[in-house]
Each structure stands twice: as C-alpha cells, then as structure tokens.
Amino acid sequence: MRFTLSWLLEHLETNASLEEITDKLTHIGLEVKDVVDNTKLAGFIVAKVLEVTPHPNVDKLKLCKVDNGSKILQIVCGANNVREGLKTVLASLGSTLPESNFTIKPTKIRGVLSEGILCSASELMLAQEKSKGIIELSDDYKVGNKFFNCDPVIDINVTTNRGDCLSVHGIARDLAATGIGTLNSLIYSSAIPAHDTGIQDRSKSGMTRSSSINVKVIDGESFISGVYISNVRNKESPRWLKDRLESVGMRSISAIVDITNYIMMSFGRPMHAYDAKKIEGKLIVRKANNGEKFTGLNGKEYLLNNDISVISDNNNIHAIAGIIGGKCSKCTLETTDVFLESAWFNPISVTKSSRQLNISTDSSYRFARSVDPGFILDGLHFAAQMIVDLCGGKASNVVFAGSLDEADTKVSFDYQDVNKFGSVSVLPDEMFDILTKLGFSTDKKTENNWNVKVPSWRSDVTIPADLVEEVVRIYGYDKIKEEPLIDNVEVEINTHDNLRVLMISRGFHEVFTWSFMSESIAEKFGYSNKLFIIDNPFNNNFNIMRPSIVPNLLQVTADNIVHGMSDLAIFEIGPVYDSLDQPKYSLSGIRTGNNLPRNHYNTDRKIDVFDAKADLIAALELFNVSYGNLTIERAEKEYYHPGKSGTLSFKNKATGYFGELHPNILDLFDIKQKVVGFEMILENMGNLPVSREKFIDYKHQSVKRDFAFIVNRDVEVGKIINMVKKSSELITEVFVFDVYHGNNMEPNKMSIALSVTFCSPTHTLIEEEIQKESSAIVNLVHKNTGGILRYT
C-alpha cells in the first residue's frame, strides 16, 4: 500500500515528522517497506520562456529570459523548440540532473552567463531515447510550481487480515489511536438528492426514482448500489489529482476514472464507473454461463464459467464482479452520462474468480480482503460529489439491490485479559481510549466485563483475543515486559529438522511424495489388513493412505533411473498409516548405484546393505541410542531380501528396518539394479531428547582385533554382533568389515569378519587381558552358532 505524506496529512492532524510516522507504523504492525523521499528533485521548477534572442557569439545558441515564478533568469539554450510563451522545466542552480549526475552552477557559455538549464525529457530520465528538444508542458502547469512531486512516498506491507489499512484513512485511524495525531472527520456535501441519504429498505430490489438504469442481483451473494449522473463533461484530471495518483504508481485515465481510483486509495472503497449510454436495460449481478466471453478494460478476452459472478445488461457483460470492468462500457472523454457503482461482493468468490482468470487488480485485491460494507453509500456520495464538482452534471437518487448482512458483531471482553496475556500494564481507561479511537464502541457491562461492538471495517475481529491484540498492538509491543527464562528449561529441538540435516550431510536429497498409493501395490508389499481406504480417490493409483514411504521412494527411484540418474540417494520424512490409529511419522531412505560420484581421488563402489544399515544407525544415534545398545534381528518386512536385511531394536521395541529390496519388489517398478533402503518410525523412539550422546574421553589406549568366523549361511550376522557386544564390558565397538562365500569354502558356509575394539576406562590393557577376551569371543561364537575361527 503506497501513499504520500501529504495525502496522509489530509486524514491525520499531526506535527510528527516523517521518521516518527514511519517508526510508529512499523511498531503497530504496518511494516514500512520503503520510503521514497524526492526532496532532492525540488530544484526542478515549472518555468515560462518570456523572450528568445540569438546568442551574440554562437549561431546555434539562444539567450532566453525565463520566469521561474519568483524572478526573471537568463538561460542559454540550444534546443530547436525553445520559443516565447513555452512552459518547460527549469533545472535551478544547485539541482542535479538525474541522467548525468551533473550539478547546475552559474556558468558562462561563450562569454554569456547562464543561470540554469532548460531540461529535455532524457536529461530527467523521463524518456529512454535522447530527446531532440526541451520538455513542452501544457497550460495547466503553474509557473513556479515544482515539476516533480517532492512529497515523500511511503510503502507499507499490509497483512491479509487488515483490508481496512488498504486505504489512507484506515492507516490514519491506526496512527491516531497511538496518540501521534488526531483523525480528521469525514465531512462531505453530496450531489445526490438530500432525501436519499441512506438505504432504508433493501427488500425492494431495484428501487429507483430518477435514474434510467435499474439494478438486480440474482447471484445470491452480492449487494450493489449506484447513482446515475447525467450531462457530465469528462476530461483530463486536474494536475493535483494526476500527481496524487501517479505518485503511488497509478496511471491517470480521465477525471471520472481517476476519481474512482482516488476514492479507492483514500477510503478503501473500490468503485466502477460505466458509460451509462452503453448499458441496455437493467444491470444484473449474476453467475456467468459456461463458455461466455468477456473483454476487459485491459483489452484481453476471458472465457468464463458458472462459478464467476458478472455484471451484465440484456446483451453484454459489463464487468467481472469486484475484479475488472468491461471494454464495452468504459468511460472515455466522450462520455456524457455515467452510472457510478458502489458494491459489496463475496471475498471468497472474488478470490476464486481472480485466480481462475489470472487477473489481479487493485479492486480485486481489496474485495478479496473484505471491504467495509458500511462505507458503500458514503463512497457513492464522495465520488458523485467529486464528479459533479469536476465534470458537472446532475446526480439521480440511489438505486440498490441484493442482500447485505449488516448485523453488528459484539464481543464480550474481560479487560484484565490484556495485562494477563499481553504481559503489559495498561490502565482500563487507556484500553477504553485505544478501542474507541480504533472505532470500537465499548459498553461497560460490569466492572471487568465489557461489551464491545466491532466496527464494520474490522471483519477480522471476532473473539476476545483479537481485542487483546488490538490493545497491545497500539499500546506498543516494545512495552511488553521481559520475563526471565526459568532455569533448567529443556529446549525442544525439532526432530524432523535434525534428521533432515543429518541425511543431507550423508549425501541424501530430500523428496516429497504423495501420502496416497495404490492398494494393489500395498498388498504386494505385504500390507493387506487395516488399510486406510479413500472413499473418493482422484484415481485408482492413489486409493489408500500409504502404510510405508518405501513404495513411493521406489517409484521416484524408477523415474530417475529412466532419465539416466542411476546413482541416487533420497529420503523423506512424512506420515504413514499402517494401522487404523493415528498416523505415525516415518523416516525412510533409498540408495542405489555407486556410493560416490566419479572422481580421480577415490574409487567408487556399488552400494550394499551395510550402507543402509549405517544410515539407520546414524539416525538412531540422534536419539541418544548408541550402536552398542541396539540388537539386530532378521527383518520383519517381506519386501526386503531375507538374507540381506535386518531389524534394529532398542529396549525390545523395533525402531527401524534396513536391507536390500527384494528382487520381486524391484520388478514391480522395472528396476534392474540393486537398491537398498531403511525406515524408522519416529514415535517408537518415545520421549527421548533429540541430542548427541555425550562424548566419553577414554584416557587409555584402545586395541583392535579382527576375527573371521566360518559359519553356516543361515546364521544371522546380527546375532553374532549382539552376542559379541554383550560378552564383555571392555568391548566398545563391534562391526562387520567383510562377508565372503565362494571358492575354497563349502556351499553352505560363509566367512564373517568382525573388527572388535577393546578399551578399559581405568587402565591400559595388557596382552594377557586382550588374549583372554579374544578367547572368550571365539568360544562364545562357537558355542552359539557352531562357527569356527578362520583367522585373527
């Protein structure tokens, strides 16, 4: 929302400086985005050439006597179009040309003093190409006035709930409530007949007296009013109105159109002016027919449907309600009769129509945020009077149609809530004053309980908490008391964000997939019971809520492989629905292809099941679960390879699964290469804090020993790891670094190579202790699995 300082001061009586005003705006929640202060352009003046004579020393130059409104100056000029009586732009001494950054000084040109420069459009950066002559101004420019509008322009961000602040008057009201100034009252005379100052009977749709245009509403959700102004003389807007609109980025069209834009910017009341002679019969607010076409004021043609409200007569559509007027009835300089519309349209309908048609206008922006229904008639009076004042003509009575819910919104409010929930110290009289200045009517029902009537322009205020916010906002967020933090407060860390950081650090890319999947695919993954069936799926491939993220990740993997991305690591955190209870959040990841991108430093290798296991363990460690406290068992999920997968459990509860995906599952997605994956249910981790395990500094040297056992191929590797871990308190780490089966080994046998780390927290281990622990490991594995030591 852009406005000038002088525009604001028409609505706000204040002695505050520009800086004080902008600071206060930000403090009350109307964030100042930008302030453009054009005072550096104050030296460019509207001037008039009084006399032109040849330069005594140069044929191509001329001596000009120029009136700048206060004195006559001598200017040397070489422009071909300089002549007596011409109004142009004078760059006064001390001003700086925008194009060249040249500062104007008294200069002798071929022996003759020049006291300024007569400017071309390109020198003022008003034209892209170099101008051939100096600027020629129309007669409505007054000599001595500043050429540029040097009024500071303030640009603020307005949140979607504050449609009332999409107007200069609404902004002034908020500022006045802070005590920085006083809101000026809305006083106007009206060109509309005096007996028609209100809308008393809206049940009489289309009431009219002297207008030749009637109105009707049949879309069931709109209200429209209007006035017919005859015998107008439309023309260019006066300079003050042009300057005001152009300063906030609006293009001047004509006096009638500019007046409607001026009312919109001043009071937040969108309006539309029709060339009344182009309207045949009634103006009707209705739903468009499918396939109807409409050409807007912007010259574009739009294909409409029956969700879009339009305003039409017997033959043509003249506007899309609340969004844009039609080309067929636009006001031009030849317009003599005007129908001026002031209406209320449903914000949701305007928003939907605007999105469907991809049209965004100043009008739709305001209607979508709910304009003030209480200002419909006032806006009509303001605009009609301005049109009659500037363009002449005679206004009819008001016509209106449709329904408008003007029921008063009242909120029961305990003023003690302000200090209780806002952590401020505001006196009741101060609260009462703030609410009154914001337009709320407050009746004190009891000492503590107030009955507050909400003004028509504040549709966002509906509950007591809204009133608490209003008081605290105006009183000052900077006055909220500081509260010391309580000692030993546990900081809640976002689990999902921590896991995302971890996965990305391990080379994964995050993806987001649908929460739906195909029931037939789910059944092939072993999910057949307790599925969440969707009653109205948008297609049969998405007819259940997903019981696992893995199938969706496999589909993403397949799509990437088809497009040449055979090396892939992706993960997702999202809800899964594996029972009829509430959804649970899962972390799932997939790897395929090589473990590293090709490079000349390292040799890549194909990913394997141990990569997936390492990913899962890294995720579990975020929950303070060390690898030593985990048990590994055969995978419970049917879609993993039975001999190359596992379940990691913590405190007898399954926390995650990992493994190579079953070949039959990969065939479903037409994947021809090895894929490994993992998944964990975050709720299964309980209420453990999400933090790294405290580092233990072992002061004594650790010792590593490698063991290779020959065991039957049906022995679970996880079982061996678990028993070795638990065999001694001196063992700090156990991991598999090699699995072999093939030549020189019986078909039903395999070799499992373990690396075991020993360390004592109290002393450095001696060889006898290490040998004792090693023998215990060999005996333990042989006793429980029949495995024999191959080498150490």
Curated annotation (Swiss-Prot):
Source domain of life: Bacteria
Domain FDX-ACB: 698-790
Pfam family for this entry, one: B5
EC number: 6.1.1.20
Cofactor: Mg(2+)
Domain tRNA-binding: 38-148
CDD domains assigned to the protein according to its UniProt record, in alphabetical order: PheRS_beta_core, tRNA_bind_bactPheRS
Primary residence: cytoplasm
All residue ranges annotated as the B5 domain in the record: 406-482
UniProt entry keywords in alphabetical sequence: Aminoacyl-tRNA synthetase, ATP-binding, Cytoplasm, Ligase, Magnesium, Metal-binding, Nucleotide-binding, Protein biosynthesis, RNA-binding, tRNA-binding
SUPFAM superfamilies attached to this UniProt entry: Anticodon-binding domain of PheRS, Class II aaRS and biotin synthetases, Nucleic acid-binding proteins, PheT/TilS domain, Putative DNA-binding domain
Gene Ontology CC: one annotated term: phenylalanine-tRNA ligase complex
Record localization: Cytoplasm
Stated family: Belongs to the phenylalanyl-tRNA synthetase beta subunit family. Type 1 subfamily.
NCBIfam families recorded: pheT_bact, YtpR
Subunit structure: Tetramer of two alpha and two beta subunits.
Protein name per Swiss-Prot or TrEMBL: Phenylalanine--tRNA ligase beta subunit
Organism, scientific name: Wolbachia sp. subsp. Brugia malayi (strain TRS)
Underlying gene: pheT
